[in-house]
Amino acid sequence: YRLLALPGTVDQDAGEVLPGQSGIDWSVLWDDGSQEGFLTEYDGSGTFNFQPGRGFWAVSKEGVNVASTFATVSLQADTATTIPLHEGWNIISNPFGKPVPWAAVDAANGEQLQPPFGFEGTFAQRDTLASAETGRAFYFLNDQGLEELVIPYPGAPRQADAPEPALAE
């Protein structure tokens, strides 16, 4: 298994991305963040659509090669985008075409975040969110009650009126 994501503004079912048939040629799992029974198997629902910032556990008999072009995500105040979160562990991705230093993400979200983990055979903390153009996604623990994660565009100045992270009620 690997953590898999797609870049940009995408809304595409995992079953349309991976070659072959679910359960035979590939498997996709979503982590709902709960303490037990947290991995949900692909069921064709919208939960399993690749969307900006969303990733999955995936395994495939064949390599995954997506030859589509995706529109870039929109920026808030020309500086950042946001991706939705749930409480607990989330599989996230960087929807931009450039890597984003985790220190910039942490600063944009109040500087209380734990670093994300990548998985390439073993889990390891990452100090940079590689672009989802690489197909990579990351595990992130939302233990701060965030409804969304602000991801600043690399090199964009932080503006005084840029949105603050939203806290769950």
Predicted regions and their residues:
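N-terminal exported-region signature
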Residues: Y1-L167
